[in-house]
């Protein structure tokens, strides 16, 4: 699997980042199988969060075996220093490790939350202490709304975050405002040499009222290989600034994303976009976020 430099952190991360939200509601056997599937495919970057149900608890038992083989990132969604400090320590306990490579400020989706994170007594102060004490290697910021790129750009102005995790897919790119905000974020990231990672690549639309939720994701994902491959090719082949993309929060979709990464080589971003344009119900999942 292709690897890309994780900004100034220097790690050569696999372009597919294991999105451990997929482990939040599964048992240990299913988690172990999915983790092994990722490792066998060459995925060496794992991304989890304290808020992902039991995900940290599912990863923890594997750390003795794999910790020195992976880049390990987690997140805290707490907004005060005390709450975040407690949660960072709990994450280390649950992950059965004394250090993570990256702690991220989770779901910073608007300026109100950014103010809480970066203000006096905010969670960023806890992350800085954790870095000073060797508990974390770096500090990042994440979020998933239509406003995320502009909020994350402002976040970089306030603090020298080592990484940004923000949404990007073909449908979002067709919104002129989103495209402009994303382009401005890219320039800010390049200026600071931060890592730029993405989420929601295979998000197709929101679940409709009464629709069977066939997957654990809060949105309806692409699950046809043709479209998963097109979405992957559009993003990775057309966006060299992206260091990696998080796989969807559903273990049953991991193999399709692995196949897509392998098969994307001969598909140009333009041809990939043409394939995605075939999808009549392809829409932004941020119009009505159910979480």
Can you annotate each of these PLM segments?
Residues 92-115:
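Active-site groove signature of glycoside hydrolases
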Residues 6, 18, 46, 59, ...:
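Conserved, mostly hydrophobic/aromatic
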Residues 54, 108-291:
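Beta/alpha (TIM)-barrel catalytic core signal, keyed to glycine-rich beta->alpha loops juxtaposed to Asp/Glu
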Residues 7-10, 40, 59-68, 89-98, ...:
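Acidic (Asp/Glu)-rich catalytic clusters
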Residues 1-70, 126:
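N-terminal binding-site loop/beta-alpha segment at the start of enzyme catalytic domains
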Residues 69-80, 102-106, 166-170:
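A short, structured active-site edge motif that brings together acidic residues
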Residues 26-38, 81-96, 146-156, 226-234:
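Short, acidic/polar
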Residues 14-15, 67-70, 98-102, 137-138:
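Short acidic capping loops at alpha-helix termini that bridge into adjacent secondary structure
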């Amino acid at each position: 699997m292709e690897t890309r430099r994780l900004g100034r952190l220097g790690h050569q991360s696999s372009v597919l980042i294991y999105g451990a939200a997929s482990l939040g509601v599964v048992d240990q056997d299913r988690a172990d199988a999915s983790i092994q599937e990722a490792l066998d495919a060459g995925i060496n970057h794992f991304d989890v969060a304290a808020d992902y149900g039991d995900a940290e608890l599912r990863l923890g038992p594997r750390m003795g075996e794999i910790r020195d083989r992976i880049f390990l990132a987690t997140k805290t969604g707490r907004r005060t220093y005390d709450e975040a400090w407690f949660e960072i320590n709990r994450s280390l306990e649950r992950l059965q490790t004394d250090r993570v490579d990256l702690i991220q400020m989770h779901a910073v989706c608007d300026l109100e939350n950014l103010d809480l994170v970066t203000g006096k007594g905010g969670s960023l102060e806890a992350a800085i202490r954790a870095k000073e004490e060797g508990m974390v290697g770096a500090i990042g910021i994440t979020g998933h709304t239509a406003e995320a790129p502009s909020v994350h750009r402002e976040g970089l102005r306030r603090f020298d975050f080592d990484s940004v995790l923000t949404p990007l897919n073909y449908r979002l790119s067709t919104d002129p405002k989103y495209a402009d905000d994303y382009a401005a974020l890219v320039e800010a990231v390049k200026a600071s040499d931060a890592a730029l990672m993405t989420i929601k690549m295979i998000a197709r639309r929101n679940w409709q009222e009464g629709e069977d939720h066939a997957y654990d994701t809060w949105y309806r994902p692409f699950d046809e290989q043709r479209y998963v491959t097109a979405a992957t090719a559009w993003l990775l082949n057309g966006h060299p600034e992206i260091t990696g993309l998080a796989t969807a929060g559903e273990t049953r979709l991991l193999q399709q994303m692995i196949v897509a990464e392998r098969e994307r080589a001969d598909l140009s971003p333009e041809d990939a976009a043409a394939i995605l344009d075939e999808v009549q119900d392809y829409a932004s999942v941020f119009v009505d976020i159910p979480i």
